[in-house]
């Protein structure tokens, strides 16, 4: 087999019969598979050892040669080569066909490639191939022309003869009639009898005339057909064809079936045809030109690729190796076989029968029928079911043909090439491991032993516990005591990868250092659950083992969980306290009025109470039980930095230094909390709501190295769990309090509802108005019950604590639990006007329960649909962006996009832009940011982090120009400077980073949170699409539902208000032609927007509009935006629209991810005029290629091609990629492969997918060429230290991160002192 690292591109083409025979090791002549008695392959059959190789290593069929020493000998008795049995996976055979057949892909695909090449309609082609019509393959024009007059004379003679015969017959009959009539006259017969005789005579004469006329017409038809005879002409009438052959056989040749197609292709002159088509395209119009363009695509493909079109008609069929279509014996003595064997058997049977019929000289009709059946059997083998009814096996199941083996999720591409299974892996249920450090996981001993088996065995031999590998293996299998010690040693410093399906983004696989644990469950650190989206209700996770040194290094440096604290989508920390931890820290930092040991100032006769000289003293007081951690005290601090304002006041310009004392009015809990934060972090004197905790960790991630952040979140986790236990927050029925005012509130609203009902019955309201009124009333009622609930609950109620701390849940859930459920929706998504008045605490009535089930069931169905849709969206996004990789440091472009930082109010104050986090943050500045005085605040090329943005806002700068991937000029991929900071690391993105895939994951991962439904927006007639369908609509560049017109020009609006429609006319400012939009439905309503005077109101007559402005409510069509405003605007429009959907759901994704995808959608140019280039008009060309080709042509003095940018949906863009491997593994596999083969496409292997498919390292990350060539050798010290168990003291974590024991630590054993 050839090594994947020795080639740089992969080409696909058409195989000729010669190629097929060259690959083959012999011809398969018999349909037999294996002998049912001996179970050995039959000679010359589909499993023949002589052709495909021996079934057993180094052993021939007859058993004469058995052993390696005869390697390479071909046995003279049975003809089998002595070699490995594995060659049966790679040796092919072939079947020599008795008659040529066409390849169904090229004839039946849409468009029919054969039809386009030969200029035959697919229907006609089918008639020819399946023996329903003859086709003329060649005509000897010259000979026909020369002898036409002679032939015409002959024809005239023949016609004359027919006419003469007719006249003679008529004459004779007329005379007979006369005689008969005379005879009757003489006999005196009645007039009646005479009339009968006359009628019959005349009828016979009419018949004679008709017969002669038919004969003359036939001759006329034959003659006309012959004079107009041309190649590729179809003759469906068999008699006519026979006559032509009998009379003029030497002037033309004709045939039916694939043979005729083969002859036509042989006589086909590709170059002349291409020239003629180009001529038609230059001068033609309309349909003719379109047809010529389509045909030229196929003809030019053959012309340029040098493929021979003869490859579309096969003289021999290859037989794939037998191990790839195996036959296995089942226990019952029956055999299971691959469908391909059945399909091959049909081909061989029919082929052999055809050979026999031809040898016997059977009549043509029988031979043709057999040829047709052979054609059909080869079609079924290549693509069963493509034409006619599929061939079925037992139980009416269609057989799987070669095409079916490639297609779809279960096909070769997606199942075996992109989704390989890997060795050294295991999976188990996960449980929480609160005692672990952030970079650790608990690995069950048995699983670890199995995973690390080879390492353990080698180490046992090294340490002389075992003599050889075999005995070491036995020791491991019997689990001898010394095995465990060796295992401890082997796993030290060897990271493992944990993965939880579905892996929606890159944090779904992270590396951890394993700790051996008892039991069979993997222990997972609680802080990484967010990234994995894991919980402990029975989730399972898979473990994988990186083997090579490089793999271990990558796992440790790039994938260790403590290095992956930030989300790649938004750049904000994911590893932060949640659930119990939040509650614990919230409890710890709460200040309770009048709690034990509270600070009281000195009075006349009492000293000051609650003042402490140090945190240690306060802890001592707490330990003695005289001070509560939540009581307000005064404490003197020396090791904690005061907040900024106090620091400025107390310590002035020099600032605080460790050891400087200051007094804090706070609680002991808050002091303990602040001691967890890194040294030098300003004191936080607040109650720790989840949001505050998040902002602190955010801040840490911006200011401190990752390792400090990892230590801090770990300390917060420990403290959180400890204090959550201490707080005693539990939920019981007694905690669910129903507000006493509930009944009176509901009675009040019931009265209002009664009134509305009465009005409805009197006819004052119609049905819809009544429903709307009731919905309003009950919404108010629900809110009021919620309000009463809020007031009734005490502050220390556990349920309220959980909600208020931000740990989980929200107030709506509390209201449902204890107040009332409120309004629910029906299956259509409308509110049912009767509310559910009960809370879950009181219990629902039967009717309430029933109406509540609608919404609940719809929710479940919706979630299932959403998950599938969202997964498919992610798959398309990955496919379109998979080859976007950071290729260089800086493309040096001057271009960029302008982002808003703030809005200036009329009074001159700045209001920070709410979306600054996802637009300007983490970008590279494109030009110097200068304030009014001309001072450079931030220089070009700087990274915009939080401090820089604050500096810009302080200087009063409202917008800046930043670099963006939309304007990057790198050819393939993007440059690091245009991309900016990598969200996951907080530093400039590395070269080799696969930013395309990260972008696709960042957009796809929250896809499941988006809603499915389209929602009504304030009485707009058309639904406005939102949620996931809207995101798909945007990325697929579809014309939106409820499309809104946009202004083509800048000018004044003239609005005409009709009965059902608006008509808008724009009078352009530059005096060009007016633009008219009529028939604008009134249901869509006019757009509200900001006017020049700053007011917001609906578009009205006389308003001034800018180019590209939307005129009606709804969504603009991106293709229109592209046409009117150009590529840059449409990119920004798409980014903005996608962000709106995600923001509505509260999902934070950085703009740069969406920009990467949108950039891929606008990569191509459609050619309008080809100039002197090779491009065909109407074809889609990559922009970089288009510009390069134009530069080349202009340099040579030719005409450049003209093109216009085109917006492609992501599916279309994926299929239009230059890599045929990537496109074929995405969708429409057979179509892509057909196309690629005709064009002789070459895959440069630039993207990730194609390299995964052929098994090379991907050209991203450490697989990119500039890193691949680095050589690494371990030093002697490293070799020596390879097996000593290190402690974490000296390297990874600070001293208070001791070695974890792997045993669960009872929380009660923790003293307070651990929190210092």
UniProtKB/Swiss-Prot annotation:
Keywords: DNA-directed RNA polymerase, Magnesium, Metal-binding, Nucleotidyltransferase, Transcription, Transferase, Zinc
Enzyme class: transferase
Gene3D superfamilies membership: 1.10.132.30, 1.10.150.390, 1.10.1790.20, 1.10.40.90, 2.40.40.20, 2.40.50.100, RNA polymerase II, clamp domain, RNA polymerase Rpb1, domain 3
Assigned GO CC terms: DNA-directed RNA polymerase complex
Cofactor: Mg(2+); Zn(2+)
Binding residues for Zn(2+) 2: 891, 968, 975, 978
Annotated catalysed reactions: RNA(n) + a ribonucleoside 5'-triphosphate = RNA(n+1) + diphosphate
Assembly: The RNAP catalytic core consists of 2 alpha, 1 beta, 1 beta' and 1 omega subunit. When a sigma factor is associated with the core the holoenzyme is formed, which can initiate transcription.
Its job: DNA-dependent RNA polymerase catalyzes the transcription of DNA into RNA using the four ribonucleoside triphosphates as substrates.
Protein name in the entry: DNA-directed RNA polymerase subunit beta'
């Amino acid at each position: 087999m050839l090594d994947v690292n020795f080639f740089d591109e992969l080409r696909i083409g058409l195989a000729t019969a010669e190629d097929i025979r060259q690959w083959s090791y012999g011809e398969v002549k018999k349909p037999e598979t294996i002998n049912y008695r001996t179970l050995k392959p039959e000679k010359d059959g589909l499993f023949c050892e002589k052709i495909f190789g021996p079934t057993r290593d180094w052993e021939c069929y007859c058993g004469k040669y058995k052993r390696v020493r005869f390697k390479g000998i071909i046995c003279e008795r049975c003809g089998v080569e002595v070699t490995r049995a594995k060659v049966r996976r790679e040796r092919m055979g072939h079947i020599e066909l008795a008659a040529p057949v066409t390849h169904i892909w090229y004839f039946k695909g849409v468009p029919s490639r054969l039809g386009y090449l030969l200029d035959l309609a697919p229907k006609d082609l089918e008639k020819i191939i399946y023996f329903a019509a003859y086709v003329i393959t060649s005509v000897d024009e010259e000979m026909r022309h020369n002898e036409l007059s002679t032939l015409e004379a002959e024809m005239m003679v023949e016609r004359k003869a027919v006419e003469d015969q007719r006249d003679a017959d008529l004459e004779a009959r007329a005379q007979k009639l006369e005689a008969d009539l005379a005879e009757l006259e003489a006999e005196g017969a009645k007039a009646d009898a005479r009339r009968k005789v006359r009628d019959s005579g005349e009828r016979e004469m009419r018949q004679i005339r008709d017969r002669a006329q038919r004969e003359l017409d036939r001759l006329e038809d034959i003659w006309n057909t012959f004079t107009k005879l041309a190649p590729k002409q179809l003759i469906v009438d068999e008699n006519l064809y026979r006559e032509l052959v009998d009379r003029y056989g030497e002037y033309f040749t004709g045939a039916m079936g694939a043979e005729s197609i083969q002859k036509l292709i042989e006589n086909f002159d590709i170059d002349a045809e291409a020239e003629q088509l180009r001529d038609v395209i230059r001068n033609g119009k309309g349909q003719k030109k379109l047809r010529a363009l389509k045909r030229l695509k196929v003809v030019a493909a053959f012309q340029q690729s040098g493929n021979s079109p003869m490859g579309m008609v096969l003289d021999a069929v290859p037989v794939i190796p037998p191990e790839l279509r195996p036959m296995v014996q089942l226990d019952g003595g029956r055999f299971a076989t691959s469908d391909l064997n059945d399909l091959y058997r049909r081909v061989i049977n029919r082929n052999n029968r055809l050979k026999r019929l031809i040898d016997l000289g059977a009549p043509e009709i029988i031979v043709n029928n057999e040829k047709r059946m052979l054609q059909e059997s080869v079609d079924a083998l290549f693509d069963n079911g493509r034409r006619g009814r599929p061939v079925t096996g037992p139980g009416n199941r269609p057989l799987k043909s070669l095409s079916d083996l490639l297609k779809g999720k279960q096909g070769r591409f997606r199942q075996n090439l992109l989704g390989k299974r890997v060795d050294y892996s295991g999976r188990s249920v996960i449980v929480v491991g609160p005692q672990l450090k952030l970079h650790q996981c608990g690995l069950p001993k048995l699983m670890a032993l199995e995973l690390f088996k080879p390492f353990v065995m080698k180490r046992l031999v090294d340490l002389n516990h075992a003599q050889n590998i075999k005995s070491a293996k036995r020791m491991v299998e019997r689990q001898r005591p010394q095995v465990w010690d060796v295992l401890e040693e082997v796993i030290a410093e060897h990271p493992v990868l944990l993965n939880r399906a579905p892996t929606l983004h890159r944090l779904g696989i992270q590396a951890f250092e394993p700790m051996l644990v008892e039991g069979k469950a993997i222990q997972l650190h609680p802080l990484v659950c967010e990234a994995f989206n894991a919980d402990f209700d029975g989730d399972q996770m898979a473990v994988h083992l990186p083997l090579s040194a490089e793999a271990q290094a990558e796992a440790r440096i790039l994938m260790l969980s403590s290095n992956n604290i930030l989300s790649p989508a938004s750049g904000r920390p994911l590893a932060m306290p949640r659930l119990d931890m939040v509650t614990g820290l919230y409890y710890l930092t709460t200040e309770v009025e009048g709690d034990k040991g509270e600070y009281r100032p000195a009075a006349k006769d009492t000293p000051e109470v609650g003042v402490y000289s140090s945190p240690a003293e306060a802890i001592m007081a707490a330990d003695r039980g005289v001070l509560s951690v939540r009581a307000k005290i005064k404490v003197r601090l020396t090791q904690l930095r005061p907040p900024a304002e106090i620091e400025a006041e107390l310590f002035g310009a020099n600032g605080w230094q460790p050891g400087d004392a200051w007094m804090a009015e706070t609680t002991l809990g808050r002091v303990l909390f602040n001691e967890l934060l890194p040294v030098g972090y300003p004191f936080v004197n607040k109650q720790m709501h989840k949001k505050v905790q998040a902002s602190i960790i955010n801040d840490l991630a911006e200011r401190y190295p990752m390792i400090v952040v990892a230590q801090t979140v770990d300390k917060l986790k420990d403290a959180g769990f400890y204090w959550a236990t201490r707080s005693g927050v539990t939920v019981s029925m007694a905690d669910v309090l129903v507000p006493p005012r509930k009944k009176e509130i509901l009675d009040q609203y019931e009265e209002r509802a009664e009134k509305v009902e009465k009005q409805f019955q009197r006819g004052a309201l119609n049905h819809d108005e009544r429903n709307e009124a009731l919905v309003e009333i009950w919404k108010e009622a629900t809110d009021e019950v919620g309000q009463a609930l809020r007031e009734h609950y005490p502050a220390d109620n556990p349920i309220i604590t959980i909600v208020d701390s931000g740990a989980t849940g929200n107030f709506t859930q509390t209201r449902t639990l204890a107040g009332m459920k409120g309004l629910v929706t029906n299956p259509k998504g409308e509110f049912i006007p009767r509310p559910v008045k009960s809370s879950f605490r009181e219990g629902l009535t039967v009717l309430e329960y029933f109406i509540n089930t609608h919404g609940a069931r719809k929710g479940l169905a919706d979630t299932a649909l959403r998950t599938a849709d969202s997964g498919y969206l992610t798959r398309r996004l990955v496919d379109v962006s998979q080859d976007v990789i950071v290729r260089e440091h800086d493309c040096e472009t001057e271009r960029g996009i302008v982002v808003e930082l703030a809005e200036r109010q009329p009074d001159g104050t700045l209001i920070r832009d709410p979306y600054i986090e996802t637009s300007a943050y983490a970008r590279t500045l494109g030009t110097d940011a200068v304030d009014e005085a001309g001072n450079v605040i931030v220089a070009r090329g700087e990274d915009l982090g939080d401090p820089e943005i604050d500096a810009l806002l302080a200087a009063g700068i409202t917008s800046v120009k930043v670099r963006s991937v939309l304007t990057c000029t790198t050819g393939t991929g993007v440059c690091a400077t245009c991309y900016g900071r990598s969200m996951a690391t907080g530093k400039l993105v590395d070269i080799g980073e696969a930013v395309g895939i990260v972008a696709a994951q960042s957009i796809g991962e929250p896809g499941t949170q988006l809603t499915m439904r389209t929602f009504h927006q304030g009485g707009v007639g058309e639904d406005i699409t939102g949620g996931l369908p809207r995101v798909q609509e945007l990325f697929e560049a579809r014309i939106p539902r409820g499309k809104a017109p946009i202004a083509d020009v800048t000018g004044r609006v003239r609005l005409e208000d009709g009965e059902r429609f608006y008509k808008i006319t724009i009078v352009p400012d530059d005096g060009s032609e007016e633009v008219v939009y009529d028939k604008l439905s009134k249901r869509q309503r006019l757009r509200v927007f900001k006017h020049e005077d700053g007011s917001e109101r609906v578009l009205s007559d006389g308003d001034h509009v800018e180019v590209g402005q939307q005129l009606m409510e709804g969504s603009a069509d991106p293709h229109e935006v592209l046409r009117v405003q150009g590529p840059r605007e449409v990119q920004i429009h798409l980014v903005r629209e996608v962000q709106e959907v995600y923001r509505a759901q509260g999902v934070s994704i950085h703009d740069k991810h969406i920009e990467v995808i949108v950039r891929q959608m606008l990569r191509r140019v459609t050619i309008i005029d080809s100039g002197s280039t090779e491009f065909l008009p109407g074809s889609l060309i990559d922009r970089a290629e288009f510009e390069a080709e134009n530069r080349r042509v202009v340099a040579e003095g030719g005409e450049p091609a003209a093109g216009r940018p085109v917006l492609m949906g992501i599916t279309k863009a994926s299929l239009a990629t230059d890599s045929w491997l990537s496109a074929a593994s995405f969708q429409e596999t057979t179509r892509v492969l057909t196309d690629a083969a005709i064009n002789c496409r070459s895959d440069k292997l630039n993207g990730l997918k194609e390299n995964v498919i052929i098994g090379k390292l991907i050209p991203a990350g450490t697989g990119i060429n500039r890193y691949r060539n680095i050589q690494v050798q371990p030093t002697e010290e490293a070799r020596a230290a390879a097996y000593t168990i290190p402690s974490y003291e000296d390297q990874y974590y600070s001293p208070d991160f001791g070695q974890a024991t792997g045993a669960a630590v009872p929380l009660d054993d923790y003293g307070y002192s651990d929190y210092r």
